[in-house]
Design a protein with these regions (language model features):
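Short, Asp-centered acidic motifs that coordinate Mg2+ and/or phosphate
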Residues: 131-133
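Structural helix-boundary/capping segments
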Residues: 1-23, 41-50, 110, 121, ...
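Short helix-loop capping/hinge segments that flank enzyme active sites or metal/cofactor-binding pockets
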Residues: 11-23, 72-124, 136-140, 180-183, ...
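Small-aliphatic-rich amphipathic alpha-helix that forms the alpha element of a beta-alpha
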Residues: 124, 158-181
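Short, surface-exposed loop/helix-turn segments at secondary-structure junctions
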Residues: 143-164
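Short glycine-rich, flexible loops that bind phosphorylated cofactors or substrates
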Residues: 28-29, 141-142
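Acidic-enriched catalytic cores of C-N bond-cleaving enzymes acting on peptides and small amides
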Residues: 1-3, 29-62
């Protein structure tokens, strides 16, 4: 039996797929910029024009997953040992995450882990009915270098990151494959992506679908290159 490799999936038609979509973030305070919503709507229209069934769904994850994921984030920041005389070399946010992580009890960590496992199972029960799920990749157009840390409080840096990455972060928990498609551009020439997430082990379908969308849109980047390239 011949097993397709990723390069072969890129030249294989995906067939007619059933694709869910949603654009409502569950992270408190996260708002999706109009330009990002325009990219999302255009991507949905492209998928429909290619013959796929596009279905609107509610977010499969609830707002409670944010706090649970945050506890895990704190703990994982402590995984690698850092010598006492090197702690000050860490970025301020990394130091703060480690402080929270070391202050997190084992029961709190295990409770968050168990809650995320239950949330993942519940979400997969919904999304497994579809071949892929379409969302914005992030909530805002590209931010300037230093924007996340251009605040007085390091906790606000973390909040900005959570609001910005409201859609992709959860896939670090579920293990689902996901791909960013740079299909849209701001008036200033900055790329805006949309994200397709697949079933567990469904990388091949995502690659085939992404290649089909790229072909239909005449390529992702075309001749758009920074002058330094």
């Amino acid at each position: 039996m011949h097993v397709l490799v990723h390069e072969e999936y890129a030249t294989r038609e995906p067939g007619r797929l059933r694709i869910a979509r949603y654009a409502r973030p569950v992270v408190p305070g996260a708002d999706v910029a109009p330009e990002v919503l325009a990219a999302y709507a255009a991507a949905a229209a492209t998928l429909a024009a290619l013959g796929h069934e596009v279905v609107e769904i509610d977010p499969p994850f609830g707002a409670e997953t944010v706090s649970e994921f945050t506890v895990m984030w704190y703990a994982f920041a402590c995984m690698h040992p850092v010598a006492d005389d090197q702690v000050e070399l860490l970025r301020p946010l990394t130091r703060r995450l480690r402080e929270h992580g070391f202050a997190t009890s084992a029961p709190a960590f295990l409770q968050a882990q168990a809650a995320l496992q239950l949330a993942t199972r519940a979400a997969l029960a919904v999304t497994n009915a579809y071949d892929a799920v379409l969302t914005p990749t992030v909530t805002q157009p590209p931010r300037p270098v230093g924007w996340f840390e251009d605040v007085d409080d390091v906790e606000e840096t973390f909040e900005r990151m959570k609001r910005f990455a409201a859609f992709p972060a959860i896939y670090n928990v579920t293990g689902q494959p996901a791909v960013n498609l740079p299909l849209h551009w701001t008036e200033d020439g900055l790329p805006i992506g949309v994200m397709l997430a697949g079933r567990l082990g469904g990388e091949g379908t995502l690659i085939s679908l992404s290649a089909q969308v790229e072909s239909a849109r005449g390529g992702f980047w075309g001749d758009r290159r920074p002058p330094v390239w």
